[in-house]
Amino acid sequence: MDDDQQFCLRWNNHQSTLISVFDTLLENETLVDCTLAAEGKFLKAHKVVLSACSPYFATLLQEQYDKHPIFILKDVKYQELRAMMDYMYRGEVNISQDQLAALLKAAESLQIKGLSDNRTGGGVAPKPESSGHHRGGKLSGAYTLEQTKRARLATGGAMDTSGDVSGSREGSSSPSRRRRKVRRRSMENDAHDNSNSSVLQAAASNQSILQQTGAGLAVSALVTTQLSSGPAAGTSSQASSTQQQQPLTSTNVTKKTESAKLTSSTAAPASGASASAAVQQAHLHQQQAQTTSDAINTENVQAQSQGGAQGVQGDDEDIDEGSAVGGPNSATGPNPASASASAVHAGVVVKQLASVVDKSSSNHKHKIKDNSVSSVGSEMVIEPKAEYDDDAHDENVEDLTLDEEDMTMEELDQTAGTSQGGEGSSQTYATWQHDRSQDELGLMAQDAQQRDPQDLSITRIAGLTWNEWNARLAMPLVTLREGVQPLVFPTDLSVDKQQGAAGLTAKDVNVSGRKTPTDGGGCKSEPRAASTPARTHSSSNHSSNGNGSGKPTKTSSGGKLNHLTEEEATALMLKAVAEKQAAAAAGTELSFGEDQASSGNGNSSDYPATLSGAVTFADVGGPAGLCHINILNSISAMNNLISGSTAAGVGITTGSGQSPSNSGHNNSAGGGSSVLGGADNGAGHPCPVCGRVYKLKSSLRNHQKWECGKEPQFQCPFCVYRAKQKMHIGRHMERMHKEKFKLEDVKNFAGSSGLDGDSSGATATAASVVAAAAALVSGVELHPHFS
């Protein structure tokens, strides 16, 4: 008997102790696992306490599998919520008489035990919403567990009633105005979570998925699906209240966003009726989860096909006023642009999203499929990859917002033509990106290879042809290590392209309109471009200077001037260097001046262009054998780089004893400018100062405003290079002030370069390029100029 005796251990203050422990945990915010929000303020709580004190919260929390859900109570004030929390945790609360009615009403809507009668019902239920940063919160969870919830609801009771009401609010979510102003990708993710997540999951195993790849149509479907939740939720609460006596369905969606209210009030009657019928059918067959899913899809499809035809009046902040389109067929037609426009007018999309919709729908790079909306009962499914297509669109939009100063002519040169890609796809600059140590000469050869396809698409940029731009940009400062003798490059070389070794007819006479600062007596070698025609390559043809004065020309040509290509200009440089090396090796004293220019050693047919003030070879001192070749003394000097192989329309014949340079000088001795007959054929607009011809008058005005007669305004911080364009300085620094050049590139360029021309002078020049390149490979070192 004694062994069977049992003792009863009683905790006298058990309940009060437990309640006090919960109160302490709440005050310390320990082990809290949910948050209640009202009027923008938050209160943390414990799920177990809320479930024990309210069957409404018990049902709500059973549907939530998030670790810490957030519930937003629309119709409850924060003071009332705080009082109800004190009541649930402590069992009592002190409140004034004027707040008693509101507190009891809120407590009855939340079914708090002791403050409400759960048997009679008829209260007002606020609409809790889950925050978007918890993966859709309650709404997505209710959609995902739809079949489980329906099976549980079949048992009936108070839990069934509140759960069914919660189900009736599933499609009524509308993102807040703040959330609708974020980027479109976030908008699409929220729309998937709040409006269409379980519909996609339930229908994937039963119905075929509609494929659509148009970005504009995808946004239209998202917008309209979210829009349809407004009238659908309103009719859902009405249908539920007419069939069952439920305590929580009178004002389900009392405080929605203003745009959703307007949409719900102005939607078509047919749309409302069809949505109401669909929801009624869903509540009559609550045990069948698939039927409910189909009904929700039905209201989505019908609201999309009819709701877009109605104009929304008011709330200009959410309606894109710039899109004044909204016909009866705007949403149902196969055109995705009209569908997206009607979705914009539905009042859900803000102006930022509307502009993205319009841009995406008009993008011709995406294929658009018709028949995106099927008949009643089918699924409205958005292809997930439509979201990733927007990344390219966003990048294009961002690229268009570049500052105009950053959009240099070099970038326009690479992106203008249809046959040319961007800088990454261009053959010229792809090589440059992969090997930054390339020689400038190799780059010029690659540029020349692309000039022909460029001429087929775009002939001029800012009034300049491709050859003119290449002549401006392609010749940087180069340093050649060679002999001790200073090498002065001829600064005013007239071209006489002869048909043969004894030809006397000049195909082109190119003279400069810029007067060189020399007197009439003699010409001295200066660092600036002011010297006389210097010693040239010796050949069998010696056409001596007619007057023997060697004065530089001062004429201005009114004819059409064609500029040198990079190969021709580089050939001149390499040829002069080779001759300089050969002369230094032979011990010949190189003297450049009037005496040698008039001695008959100069052959004008060897240099294929007039270089008036463009090139200067000067000795800068320092170690012996270091000679600096300043090709781009000024951009304006490069304007006078003129090709003598293409302008066949210029016909000026020179005598056997007079060079074209002196002939041009005699023509302009009286102070007038000689116009070469037949060069322009009456077309174009010549510059009265320098004689350059432009096809457009605006290009001529540009030239006169920024270039003609203007000194270079931009100075390279590392060398003496100056330019009239800021972009030229940038390109110069990028290419020239890098690591050393490689001689292999010079060899490749010398082997592949060939001058375009039909005379023997061009052939001789090409041969000299090969010889000069061979001499360079043997002992010449190219490196940047960092003076």
UniProtKB/Swiss-Prot annotation:
Q: Name one GO biological process term.
A: axon midline choice point recognition
Which residue numbers delimit the BTB domain? Answer: 32-97
Per UniProt, subunit arrangement is: Isoform D interacts with JIL-1.
Q: Which organism is it from?
A: Drosophila melanogaster (Fruit fly)
Q: Could you tell me the gene encoding this protein?
A: lola
**Cellular component GO terms, alphabetical:** nucleoplasm; nucleus
Please note every region of biased composition (Low complexity).
162-175, 228-251, 263-293, 329-340, 537-560, 659-668
Q: Zinc finger regions typed C2H2-type: which residues?
A: 685-707, 714-737
Region annotated Disordered sits at 115-200, 228-340, 506-560, 653-677
State the protein's name. Longitudinals lacking protein, isoforms A/B/D/L
Q: What does this protein do?
A: Putative transcription factor required for axon growth and guidance in the central and peripheral nervous systems. Repels CNS axons away from the midline by promoting the expression of the midline repellent sli and its receptor robo.
